[in-house]
Regions:
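Conserved "HGTGT" condensation-loop signature of ketosynthase/thiolase-family condensing enzymes
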Residues: 1-60, 80-81
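Conserved catalytic cysteine-centered active-site region
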Residues: 18-20, 24-36, 64-116
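Short flexible/disordered coil segments
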Residues: 47-51, 90-94, 117-124
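A short, small-residue-rich loop immediately preceding and capping a beta-strand
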Residues: 57-61, 87, 115-123
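Active-site-adjacent elements of ketosynthase-type condensing enzymes
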Residues: 6-12, 66-76, 121-124
Length: 124
């Protein structure tokens, strides 16, 4: 969906959106939803990081478009990937959600609440 497409249904313009957000177009996932996309991302993250689901201590999903309010999306990801020891919660902060989720995870790690997989492996 382009900015031009949006300007046909709401009072805006490509220039207005682009200058304020840098966004030119969006994708629509017709067969997917927030939960299925988050589960896929979780599985890919495990594979790319080379860790098991049992090693995961926390799952933070940043979204303002959950499929359900209960159970939250993070808990659905937790179950689907088998991260039975993880704390799981959603964080809703609209466009800045990713930054808030990342800084929350960083604070947990820095504070010693959770560890990076590499840190845990070095302690064994």
């Amino acid at each position: 969906v382009t900015n031009e497409d949006l300007s046909k249904i709401v009072e805006t313009s490509d220039e207005w959106i682009s200058s304020r957000s840098g966004i030119k177009e969006r994708r629509v996932a017709k067969e997917e939803n927030t939960t299925s996309l988050a589960i896929l991302a979780g599985k890919r993250a495990l594979e790319n990081a080379g860790v098991t689901a049992e090693e995961i201590e926390v799952i933070i999903v940043a979204t303002c478009t959950p499929d359900y309010f209960f159970p939250n999306t993070a808990c659905q990801v937790q179950e689907a990937i088998g991260a039975k020891h993880a704390v799981a919660f959603d964080l809703s902060a609209a466009c800045s959600g990713f930054l808030f989720a990342l800084s929350t995870a960083q604070a947990y790690i820095k504070g010693g609440i959770y560890q990076l997989s590499e840190q845990k492996r070095c302690q064994k």
